[in-house]
């Protein structure tokens, strides 16, 4: 089954605060794969409509907050244009990282689980 993708024009705030938590809350498969995960992930999006967003993962539940949490398990740095290309499936995270458009700071293994959260 193909997972739903966010609208192409979704704002980062709408994506992190509403779309991601709702997508996980309505997907039992994602919840099950995140059942053993407790983590705080900060997304640092640069450029127009960018900002800091925190995603809290707690045993299958996901909550989005505006701003950067202190001492996150993982911080993901990218610009809004790259974030949009990732959301639309026009590029992959490994490709963006190789082009230095995406950078992880912290628990890299958690970074590998992001596709479970974000789709």
Regions found by a protein language model. Name each.
Residues 1-119:
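Feature captures hydrophobic
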């Amino acid at each position: 089954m193909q997972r739903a993708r966010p609208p192409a024009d979704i704002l980062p705030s709408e994506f992190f605060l509403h779309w991601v938590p709702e997508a996980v809350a309505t997907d039992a498969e994602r919840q099950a794969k995140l059942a053993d995960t407790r983590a705080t992930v900060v997304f640092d999006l640069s450029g127009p409509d960018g900002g800091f967003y925190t995603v809290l993962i707690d045993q299958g539940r996901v909550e989005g907050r505006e701003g950067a949490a202190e001492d996150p398990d993982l911080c993901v740095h990218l610009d809004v244009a790259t974030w949009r290309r990732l959301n639309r499936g026009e590029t992959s995270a490994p490709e963006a990282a190789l082009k230095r458009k995406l950078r992880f700071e912290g628990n890299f293994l958690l970074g590998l689980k992001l596709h479970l959260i974000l789709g």
